[in-house]
Amino acid sequence: MLLSRERAKFSSARRKVRIAAVIAKAMSRTNFGLTMPPEEIAAVRSKNEFLEVPISRKQSMSHRILLSISIVAVLCNCACSKWLEISNLKIKQEPTELGGPKTIIVYDIEAPDISPESPAYVFVRFSKDKSNWRLITKESLRGNGFDIIEKPGHKQVIWWGTGQTSFNEFDKVDIRLRGIRMIRVPAGQFVMKSLPGGGRDESKEIQPSSKLPLFYMARYETTISMYTDYLNEIGAEGAGWNKRMTNTDRCGIIPNSDNTYSVAPGRDNYPITYISWYDAMNFLQWCGLRLPTEAEFEKAIRGGLFLDGDETKKDPNPMPERPYPWGDEAPNSNGVFRCNYDGTEDGFEYTAPVGSFDIFSSPYGICDLAGNVAEWTLDWYSTSYHTGLDGFRMVRGGSWMAVPFACDAITGATQLPIKESSIMGFRAAK
């Protein structure tokens, strides 16, 4: 043990930082590279100083910028497809008290409206020598720049597990940060029930009052561009794409000749479709997240008895039994179209860009819980919530093919988890 520590200290002292700026391919929508002039390549001031690369706003919105050094490389993500914008990425490595290395990452997250009620979720992934990418679990991270982030600004992440990955001075390690807008749903009671009639599931138990702990749900459905980033990162590690995704009316992911994928023009912000339950779960595990349960989905639509939760009870829900996220008006009441449902009168023949009906969001501000795409939930089908054996999975929320009343908080449908449909997508929960 002592000898290993001495070797680590000796190796750390000898380590010379080698830097080469590499401009990666643009995010999944393009195959064109970008050449960085030599004068823009960051200089290393000392081995313990941050490495800085000038990143214009235009570049950070459109291109990945990889900084390849002996220990760490950083990806700058774009925010054009419901990833939150992360900029001014800087990194350094320092020894820990035990002599092993720790990696420090600092960055800015610029969305001005990040708050405790509408936080960001930031996750970190790494790859050693271009091998398989891996999620850095939150147990290996410290600082204010990962997991749930409740205010914008300058953030820091300390990765304590660097030494456990057997890095050496000749390795090239890429690090990628991505952020998702989440919505906080406070703990507390809410009205959960199933009523007979229409497409509603009459076999469900009526539960006039239920209680859930605090959870978070993505403000938007997962987009085509987000899912394409995932496909391009996992590469040959797994499946997740099928030929129907090339349909540019209902999806729009195009395979390239180099085993990568691109988003069809103009389709970045549309919800991903033709997704099985397993595909959705794999994407969310890639992020460190999960699918919402049926109960969470219904509470996200209706809101709790108190919108600030049972702990404070200062903001009573004026419509705790509302059938739709916006209230009790039908989706097409009085010629106002509140979600994307069957037909074209709402302005969309197929899916709509996520957030198109944001003024008709849920009491918490979650968009598109009614219509657009029906969404996978975590639950197996059963006659009571949360329980059941392997078989069908539940989808909620209605879709662009649903009649208006089927876009409510009550209606659910059963699907085999292998089903891939143009009317089904998903969103994240935590």
How should these model regions be labeled?
Residues S68-N77:
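Bacterial N-terminal signal peptides
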Residues C76-E85:
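Bacterial Sec-dependent signal peptides at the C-terminal "C-region" and cleavage site
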Residues S81, A352-G355, I359-S362, G388-K430:
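Disulfide-stabilized, aromatic/cysteine-rich ligand-recognition loop
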Residues E97-D108:
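Contiguous beta-strand segments within globular domains
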Residues P112-S118:
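A short beta-turn/strand-edge loop motif at beta-sheet boundaries
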Residues R125-S127:
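Conserved Ser/Thr-centered positions that define the repeating blades of beta-propeller domains
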Residues R134, S194-G199, K211-Y341, S382, ...:
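Active-site microenvironments of metalloenzymes and redox enzymes
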Residues G266-N269, N340-A370, A413, I418:
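Short, well-ordered junction/capping motifs at the entry into regular secondary structure
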